[in-house]
């Protein structure tokens, strides 16, 4: 009986809540809707808050409250994890209120929303690049902001995502090998460019390992007149690699490479 009574009480509260929300939707009092929207927002009922704010946004257009409504609409979409829409609303806020009271938050969230929305490294990375650009603008404008540390952290992760994409590309070229051309050379170029463009990325050993492998394969498959030069080049790369990564998980394999290299260089 107690359990049934509790369920009935919950049902009554739910129906009352729904009835109140439906009444608010029909209300002609913008102030009542605004205050209710803030209450729903604080209760994390973002869809209800967003709906009410959308309904009154045109009424308050051009007023001081319009700024608050735009900021809260962006927050509502953020709360719903609708990052693309949140980005658009925060961007709209920055355009309309570049020095507004929510400007610091809005500039940060333009980057953060796109950071949250950035796809897997195998996919197109335009959103990732947009997020980096937004964070760059943010830290230039607000270097002392409480959000600055998080912006730098997330920007570093975004750069790593771009580097990971280049790692996938370099690995793909390596796997293609000599199919329809010298893909080992392409692998080497992509890996070197990634190290240049993303000098602090966390995949540096992986890139350097691919470079060494690519050089080694080009040596092995080289015509005789180029083999000695390529062997010496690969040997230099070997020493660079083991100097930088003496405890690399690839050390045994690199040492086997050196044996084959020395058969050519006669050293």
What is the meaning of each model-derived region?
Residues 2-6, 14-267:
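Acidic, polar-rich low-complexity tracts and alpha-helical solenoid repeat scaffolds
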